[in-house]
Amino acid sequence: MKRNFVNHLLHPTIAARIILRKWLGISISTWTINFIFQRILRQNGDIAFQVHFTSKVLGTGQIKLGRNVWKSFALSGGCYVQSGNGVIIGDDTIFGPGVKIISANHDPNNHMTWKIGPPIKIGSRCWIGANAVILPGVELGDDCIVGAGAVVTKHFTHQSVLVGIPARSVRKQIS
């Protein structure tokens, strides 16, 4: 019993819920925890949409989100979005926990600046699996599925199923 309790304390969401329920006598949702961290404690406070409190978003002015994408960011923890060159995400795209979206690399001659390049474009209704990495300049068509842990380094057309490091298309979805 003690070991299980200690394991739960290692996960911040569960730890916050246990503390609030046990000592304050209230139950709390993930949405409320995100609100407290983002709006009151100002972690990712400059972002207009809700983000999970364990995620980090940089360059918020360069992000364009489609319809319902913010819900996935609010529920998927541990995500990292660096949008130096811009990130455009289509409607109803879903992200797993730990997804990394990196839109710019450092200039090799000056490590304090980013290389200018095209934005990352992710189509509508895509699924991005847990711990997947999407690198600068990538374009994913609509209805793509990126497997867990895949590293996407190049463009893929619509309805591609991507896996591996570097990601490769293993098949097309059948609608």
Name each model-derived stretch:
Residues P97, I102-P118, S124, A130-S175:
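Glycine-rich hexapeptide-repeat left-handed beta-helix
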Residues M1-S103, P108, S124, S175:
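Domain-scale signature associated with acetyltransferase and cell-envelope carbohydrate enzymes
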